[in-house]
Amino acid sequence: MTKYVFVTGGVVSSLGKGIAAASLAAILESRGLQVTLLKLDPYINVDPGTMSPFQHGEVFVTEDGAETDLDLGHYERFISARMRKVNNFTTGQIYESVLRKERRGDYLGKTVQVIPHITNEIQDFVARGAEAAWNGATDVAIVEIGGTVGDIESLPFLEAARQMSLRMGRNNAAFVHLTLVPYIASAGELKTKPTQHSVQKLREIGIYPNVLLCRADRRIPDDERAKISMFSNVPLDAVISVWDVDSIYKIPAMLHKQGVDNIVCEALGLTPPPADLSMWDNLVDALEHPQDSVTIGMVGKYVDLTESYKSLSEALVHAGIHTRSKVNIEYIDSEDIETRGTDQLKHLDAILVPGGFGKRGTEGKIAAIRYARENGVPYLGICLGMQLAVIEFARHVAGLGGANSTEFDPAAPHPVVALITEWMDREGRVERRDNSSDLGGTMRKGAQRCPIRPGTRAQSIYGDDVNERHRHRYEVNNVYVPRLEDAGMVISARTPTENLPEMMELPSHPWFVGVQFHPEFTSTPRDGHPLFSSYIRAALEHKAQRAKEA
């Protein structure tokens, strides 16, 4: 029988519940348990796919094509289990499901209410998500409840968790509450009152936390922990100090040293073997003792909110770990390049243009790509970054003046990137789309395996085929591929069914690669990722070459 750990948050949002949940999962996995994680989001959107990055941050795409919360990216980076659509659901999905049942008559004419119908549906979704992992043999499912205790939106989820723990009985559910202990500089002290009130609010609805994770910008002294313990009715050894660190990969060791996993295992009636966190210790050691460093320029339009590129930033960190180098990421606003030019790129060891949507800032990205191509700077283009690399090459090398994407200019004289109106989904069904189709359901999403052209850089990186995740509506237009290849571009991977370009490269350049997929979603600190490791090695070589020429 699967046991559950519910992770809640108090005082303020963005405290790092996802990191805390993933870190606990990593410790339990190191103790030999089969663990999965779920994220419950209280917003009414069906999924975050059409939400602004400024509102929600990154949209993480799972292997089965679900557009999910960025916390699922943390989950995959911390444990070995792969996340799926069932690992993340929202209030919108719950209500959508309940309303469908009501229309079908499943409730036999009863008045449909939040309790019991909505809360029962939440419990069914949670159980289904837990059973989907490990062929139904999940030992522990850690369930992160989004939002903050006291929010109206979170109440049905908290009530469902309370009911679930009651129904399952003793030693089958535990609660971990993450809260803020702010430091007031003018008073020179930490304040525990917000945490006390947060726990009181939780207890009012019938939830009594087994563990309190107290987040602060410094270690919380024992006397303050004792005060929190007394007023919150949580044992002192379960009041855990969680202070700011320079790497999220230090959190598992921090929690383990304070006995969090032992408290949770005791609450769940589990006696697994001791934890082995040597892998995490080695990762942290590699992070703290790099042998070299590189500076990567990430050119985008969401640079003021780096959460929009969370998986990508982490993938570069992973590549640094596996090349024993410190990767410094410099976020550059593409609109700034449009006004100030490319001189601000001269100090960079490599340039990267990530995925994105919309016309704003695209000419700045194209200027950065041209700078990388003409100056031999290693370049990696992801999704939109590949499409813009094709546009830049078409304009300035292949002689296709005015080349563009129909996303930005529907009347472009040379639409080298266009909306593909018909394609086959992962199940082999033919789907059609056009400019009037709903944004939430018209993208190519999820993992797809593609053969790689022999003798290419792509083959030296990936081998004979590549299996990566997608999230895009537009594709490189096959009509123009012969003209591009005649000018020196190589299409190094194509989809097996539609023959759509998946990877491009420039053999005449030291390292210039574009990919239509999102490799950042499959990078982990344990294994890194071959594409990003190759890219960072190229950046190190470029840096060394520039130093020789200086």
Curated annotation (Swiss-Prot):
An example Gene Ontology CC term for this record: cytosol
Database matches in InterPro entries: Class_I_gatase-like, CTP_synthase, CTP_synthase_N, GATASE, GATase1_CTP_Synthase, P-loop_NTPase
Pathway: Pyrimidine metabolism; CTP biosynthesis via de novo pathway; CTP from UDP: step 2/2
Catalyzed reactions: UTP + L-glutamine + ATP + H2O = CTP + L-glutamate + ADP + phosphate + 2 H(+); L-glutamine + H2O = L-glutamate + NH4(+); UTP + NH4(+) + ATP = CTP + ADP + phosphate + 2 H(+)
Pfam family, one: GATase
GO biological process, one term: pyrimidine nucleobase biosynthetic process
Main enzyme class: ligase
Modulation of this protein's activity: Allosterically activated by GTP, when glutamine is the substrate; GTP has no effect on the reaction when ammonia is the substrate. The allosteric effector GTP functions by stabilizing the protein conformation that binds the tetrahedral intermediate(s) formed during glutamine hydrolysis. Inhibited by the product CTP, via allosteric rather than competitive inhibition.
Annotated keywords: ATP-binding, Glutamine amidotransferase, Ligase, Magnesium, Metal-binding, Nucleotide-binding, Pyrimidine biosynthesis
Region of interest (Amidoligase domain), residue spans: 1-270
Binding site for L-glutamine: G356, L384, G385, M386, Q387, E407, R473
Annotated catalytic residues: C383, H518, E520
E.C. designation(s): 6.3.4.2
Domain (Glutamine amidotransferase type-1) ranges: 295-545
Binding site for Mg(2+): D71, E144
Binding-site list for ATP: S14, L15, G16, K17, G18, I19, D71
Binding site residues for CTP: S13, D151, I152, E153, K191, T192, K193, P194, T195, Q196, K227
Note: CTPSs have evolved a hybrid strategy for distinguishing between UTP and CTP. The overlapping regions of the product feedback inhibitory and substrate sites recognize a common feature in both compounds, the triphosphate moiety. To differentiate isosteric substrate and product pyrimidine rings, an additional pocket far from the expected kinase/ligase catalytic site, specifically recognizes the cytosine and ribose portions of the product inhibitor.
Complex and partners: Homotetramer.
Family classification: Belongs to the CTP synthase family.
Official protein name in the record: CTP synthase
Organism annotation: Bordetella pertussis (strain Tohama I / ATCC BAA-589 / NCTC 13251)
